[in-house]
Regions:
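C-terminal peripheral helix-coil segments that are non-catalytic and often amphipathic
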Residues: 1-7, 105, 140, 144-148, ...
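Generic hydrophobic, amphipathic alpha-helix propensity
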Residues: 16-28, 44, 69-77
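Amphipathic alpha-helical segments used for helix-helix packing
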Residues: 108-128, 143-146, 176
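Secondary-structure edge/capping motif, primarily at the C-terminal ends of alpha-helices
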Residues: 81-88, 117-121, 149, 178-182
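Hydrophobic alpha-helical connector segments
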Residues: 83-109
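Helix-turn-helix
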Residues: 23, 31-64, 68
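Amphipathic alpha-helical packing segments from all-alpha helical-bundle domains
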Residues: 125-151, 161-173, 196-199
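N-terminal intrinsically disordered/low-complexity leader segments
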Residues: 1-19, 150-157
C-alpha cells in the first residue's frame, strides 16, 4: 500500500509508516513467542494497537511479517556475535567464546527471539525453508570466520562448510532443548560446550 504524503506534528508520513512497521514487528514477536496465543493478523494488530489497514501498509500478509521478524533476529545474532568477536582480541579461543557468548547473551536478554527463530518457525510451513536458509547462512559465516581465526587446516572449503552446518545444526538443537527446559544448564556451560565443539570441528 502506498504511503500518503504529508507532515503531522512534525513527523512525515514515511516516518509514521516506519514507526508502525516497527510496532507490528515487535507485536509479532510478542504474539508468536506466546504459546497461549494463536498467531494471527488480528492478534498482532491488537498487540500493536493498530488497525488491519495499517498492517497491509507494510506487509502483504502474516507470513511476510513473520519472515521479517526472523530476518531481523538473524541479522541481530550475526551482528552481535561478530562485534563481540572483534572486541575479544586476536586469540582464536577468545574470539570463539566471545562470539558464542554474545549469542547466548542475546537469548538470555530476550528468550522470545530464540524461541521464534529456532523453535516456532518450524511449525509454519511457509517459513521452514526460510529457517533452513538462515541456518545455512549462519553455518557459512561460522565456517568463514572460524577458519579466518584459526588459520588454514588444509581442509577443503566443502569440508569447512560441512563442519559449519554441523555446528549450527547442533547449536539449534542445544538451544531448543535449553529454551524448552528439557536441558538444565547454565549460560556458561552452554558457551563452554559450544566453544569446545566449534574449535574441535576446525582443528
Amino acid at each position: 500500500m502506498a504511503v500518503q504524503s504529508g507532515v503531522y506534528r512534525g513527523v512525515s508520513a514515511v516516518e509514521r509508516a516506519a514507526a508502525r512497521r516497527v510496532r507490528l514487528v515487535d507485536a509479532a514477536l510478542a504474539v508468536w513467542a506466546d504459546p497461549d496465543t494463536r498467531t494471527t493478523m488480528t492478534a498482532v494488530c491488537a498487540e500493536a494497537g493498530l488497525s488491519e489497514r495499517y498492517f497491509y501498509e507494510s506487509f502483504s500478509g502474516l507470513d511476510a511479517l513473520l519472515e521479517a521478524v526472523m530476518n531481523e533476529i538473524a541479522a541481530e545474532i550475526e551482528e552481535t556475535s561478530r562485534h563481540a568477536a572483534e572486541q575479544a582480541g586476536e586469540e582464536p579461543e577468545a574470539r570463539v567464546r566471545a562470539s558464542i557468548g554474545a549469542f547466548v547473551g542475546l537469548l538470555i536478554e530476550d528468550p522470545r527471539k530464540g524461541r521464534v527463530a529456532i523453535v516456532e518457525s518450524v511449525a509454519v510451513p511457509k517459513l521452514r525453508q526460510r529457517r533452513t536458509d538462515l541456518l545455512r547462512h549462519l553455518a557459512h559465516q561460522a565456517a568463514i570466520e572460524t577458519r579466518e581465526w584459526l588459520g588454514s587446516s588444509g581442509r577443503s572449503e566443502n569440508e569447512d562448510e560441512t563442519a559449519g552446518l554441523l555446528f549450527i545444526g547442533g547449536m539449534a538443537e542445544l538451544v531448543t532443548a535449553w529454551l524448552d527446559g528439557t536441558l538444565t544448564a547454565t549460560a556458561d556451560e552452554i558457551v563452554d560446550a559450544a566453544s569446545r565443539a566449534l574449535l574441535g570441528l576446525y582443528r
